[in-house]
């Protein structure tokens, strides 16, 4: 039983810190390196983890198996099946990275990503947690939530990630009201300074947000014209997904709100 518990602790820490090496993991879980190494090898054999480089010196990351299991548990496979064709159309119209995220445990979790063809792009790993108050996807979901859920979140600490992160509850209330009115949220370097995004909430049959859809762009490439175009595109795409799921309109007056996408980091590809 202890070996199973150790393996689960290691799995949790890899998910939180990936990519991560054995020494850092051992310090984090307060276990001997030999114990951590055995757990890693067991999890690799079971298909839960993989190494980013060959040999024991490689750093460890999750495979897609935990994400797939989570989708089965929460019904996200159905959401993804509906969303991906819409995301592909959206990416084709804007040629920027498109993210799909779902609310979970006071955050939003990235479950799908379609990348732009442009050499500088936003890269976030699947399974990444994004804060509700400092990401476009998060704000989209939060603005579409019930007043009670919003107030519950606003009573908690709102961590500052960059100089532009909104950490004042009253200021965030005002922004959420604006998101509901216009149907989309924006993020201009509030989680990562080099990332901007525009997002809208996807509403399920109950009228509650089941996901958020975002267009993510390096801040250096964002213009007022592209922001306006992205806002209309992502709002329309989120509404298409919501309608296919039997839900309503994401964030327009009379519905609920749109959101704002999470930050990441820019990467230049060859």
Give a label for each model feature.
Residues 1-81, 243-247, 268:
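N-terminal helix-turn-helix
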Residues 1-4, 59, 63, 76, ...:
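Short, structured helix-loop boundary elements
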Residues 51-53, 102, 203-204:
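Short, low-complexity Ser/Thr-rich regulatory SLiMs
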Residues 55, 61-156:
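Amphipathic alpha-helical effector-binding/dimerization core
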Residues 82-93, 175, 182, 240-244:
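Amphipathic alpha-helical regulatory segments at dimerization interfaces
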Residues 119-193, 266-267:
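Short, solvent-exposed recognition segments
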Residues 149-160, 235-270:
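Cysteine/selenocysteine-centered motifs that mediate thiol-based redox chemistry or coordinate metal-sulfur cofactors
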Residues 168-238:
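Extended hydrophobic
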